[in-house]
Design a protein with these regions (language model features):
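Alpha-helical secondary-structure segments
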Residues: 53, 128-135, 168-170, 212-213, ...
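Aromatic- and charge-enriched surface segment that lines or borders ligand/interaction sites
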Residues: 100-145, 168, 245, 254-257, ...
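Surface-exposed binding/hinge segments that line
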Residues: 114, 148-194
Length: 616
């Protein structure tokens, strides 16, 4: 599924929210909907406020930063809360967030962060190091609070706040992600009142107290998320007064809304299809952005769902536990055809786990290791594995029954459906049946392990630790009744050992080499088969948005950034202000902060490494 996208692992307590939200498709008054015969222009509300409306295909899994993993949700949290550090929109290196500087002890086991004194919560209270210490300590001591981002604090020994502007984190072992802790810092005076972090979704009382560039003011499940500009944000107030994320189940309807001016921006599901993008090319007042993406698009195979306590659950097909079968299936997937016929060139053929946008970590299998497209060899593998065809040309399992695999498919993603039809053809030629289960809610069967294969995808951060952690044994649920951070129930000792090594390695080149070994291991296991690296294809109205920052500055995406840069920097088209929306202007602000850091003699021991071009 995917996002950190991060787009998966919905806590069981959220299922009722998701199910109830599926029926709530009517927007509040003031928002354009298919039921509104006279939808308002997105660029300005009736009261003169400048509103930026973003059409999205994904629904919110939770508005709690302790639970959310979907790309939309984590993107909203980047707007609501500051993180200790941020990613530079130009090249992804670490820049100040809530922390103005940071340094480590010689042994790299103690990290000290200076917390800025000019960040306030939206209720007027000062944001301090105590808020950060409380956030991390809560994640360290409460399993519910560790649901989404627990991997970041698993190696923490102690976190303290000696003063309002000083945060100290002591580690058990060296940890290479200390300037890449993608954890929203929340206000202690608000969140310490929460009794059950595994159930609290932060979606009942508005406005929600935060200290980011926007304040959450309204939400309706599967309808909209509304935020207003934080006029006291320390980096400067956004130029738009309001930001609205509006849910569209039908992406053609979202594209139509963009044409009519009912929305300012459309992201697609998770990108525009080639046909949608082509239909917008050359349209008046519409700009299409087509850039290398930070996502991978994969087929995940059920490895036999199990919990940390060793108990198995779910009903994945037993034949998929044979690596020869998994390899045969992938060798029967024509990835070039997927790029050409489904993505129509708006993607790169997939192999390794991390997209080529992040060159430091990009890995490709060797010629002898690669599972190249070879249907004949795939058939031979299945024969050798004992899954031969019967008289009707159908492959049969050990139970003598014809094999048909259930493939989980996102109902809102046209790529899933298109690739699924090809799988029915390609695997059908092997004698294997395919049943596409295209659902609005794939979370329930996924968490229950009731699938054979599934379309999967995650947005990768400049520091890839999170997307690596979701395949460790430690990410499994504690029991079959619990929810873990796991993506696909993979648990492999060799992979776990490599994960621990990369996390403790501060040398960038050495760490990158270990990460590539992890990708190689994941590839060989055959449970996560990457088919493509889709481009970020999106569009916006130039008569509503004058300028907006892409990330990275050159050939970057707008939606789903590792930061708040796009929506914070966006300048309304009818605004006389030209200082806040360009990438150059944003970089200038960052550069000023870095000059201050250098003047203070800060030593940054570890930085987020950028890819050649650039969750949740």
């Amino acid at each position: 599924m995917g996002t950190n996208d991060q787009t998966r692992s919905l806590p069981r307590g959220l299922r009722l929210v998701a199910v109830a939200g599926a029926a709530a498709l009517t927007l509040t008054a003031g928002l354009a909907t298919p039921l509104d015969p006279a939808p308002r222009q997105a660029r300005a509300a009736d009261d003169g406020k400048k509103v930026l409306t973003v059409a999205v295909a994904q629904s919110v899994d939770s508005l709690s930063p302790f639970l959310a993993v979907r790309l939309l949700s984590t993107s909203i949290h980047r707007l609501m809360y500051e993180y200790l550090t941020n990613y530079d929109p130009k090249d992804n290196h670490a820049v100040p967030g809530l922390a103005t500087k940071w340094e480590s002890s010689p042994d790299k086991l103690t990290w000290t962060y200076t917390i800025r004194s000019n960040s306030k919560w939206s209720d007027g209270k000062q944001a301090t190091a105590e808020d950060a210490a409380w956030t991390f300590n809560k994640m360290m001591t409460d399993d519910g609070a560790a649901t989404a981002n627990g991997s970041y604090v698993g190696n923490f020994e102690k976190v303290t706040a000696p003063s309002p502007t000083k945060l100290v984190i002591e580690l058990k072992k060296p940890q290479a992600t200390m300037t890449a802790l993608d954890v929203p810092i929340v206000p202690r005076h608000v969140w310490e009142k929460v009794s059950d972090f595994s159930e609290f979704n932060n979606d009942k009382s508005f406005p929600v107290v935060g200290n980011g560039p926007f304040v959450l003011t309204g939400y309706k499940a599967d309808s909209y998320v509304r935020l207003k500009a934080n006029k006291t944000f320390w980096r400067g107030a956004p130029k738009f007064d309001e930001l609205v994320f509006r849910y569209y189940k039908d992406q053609d309807a979202a594209v139509s809304a963009l044409r009519k001016g009912e929305v300012s921006f459309v992201a697609g599901s998770p990108s525009l299809t080639p046909a949608q993008a082509d239909s917008l090319e050359g349209a008046e007042n519409i700009q299409v952005n087509d850039a290398p993406g930070r996502r991978f698009y994969a087929l995940a195979t059920n490895p036999g769902a199990k919990a940390k306590n060793g108990k198995k659950f779910g009903d994945g097909h037993p034949s998929l536990l044979d690596r020869r079968v998994r390899n045969a299936l992938f060798m029967a997937v024509d990835r070039e055809a997927i790029i050409d016929k489904v993505f129509r060139g708006h993607a790169v053929e997939g192999e390794g786990y991390i997209p080529p946008r992040f060159q430091d970590y990009f890995w490709k299998p060797s010629a002898s290791q690669k599972l190249a497209y070879d249907p004949a060899k795939a058939a031979q593998l299945l024969d050798r594995a004992g899954y031969r065809k019967n008289g009707d040309g159908k492959r049969v399992g050990k139970d003598g029954k014809p094999i048909t695999y259930r493939v989980l498919c996102h109902a809102t993603d046209p790529n899933d459906k298109a690739v699924g039809k090809y799988l029915q053809e390609w695997w059908g030629d092997l004698g294997i049946g395919v049943r596409l289960d295209c659902l609005d809610n794939v979370t329930d069967p996924w968490l229950a392990g009731k699938y054979d294969l599934a379309f999967d995808g995650w947005s990768v951060n400049p520091d890839p630790d999170f997307v690596l952690s979701i395949h460790t044994c430690g990410a499994l649920p504690a029991t079959p009744q619990d929810t873990g951070a796991t993506d696909n129930f993979i648990c492999d000792k060799t992979y776990d050992e490599l994960y621990a090594r990369q996390l403790a390695e501060y040398d960038p080149a050495k760490r990158a080499d270990i990460v590539k070994q992890m990708e190689s291991r994941l590839y060989d296991l055959g449970y996560m088969n990457v088919m493509a690296y889709p481009n970020a294809v999106e569009a916006y109205r130039t008569d509503q948005i004058k300028s907006i920052t892409t990330m990275p500055a050159k050939a970057g995406n707008i939606y789903g950034q590792d930061g708040y840069w796009s929506w914070w920097s966006a300048v309304p088209a009818d605004s006389g202000d030209s200082s806040g929306g360009s990438s150059t202007a944003v970089v200038a602000v960052i550069a000023t902060s870095l000059v201050l850091l250098i003047g203070l003699g800060t030593v940054v021991a570890v930085r987020r490494r950028a890819g050649a071009d650039d969750r949740e």
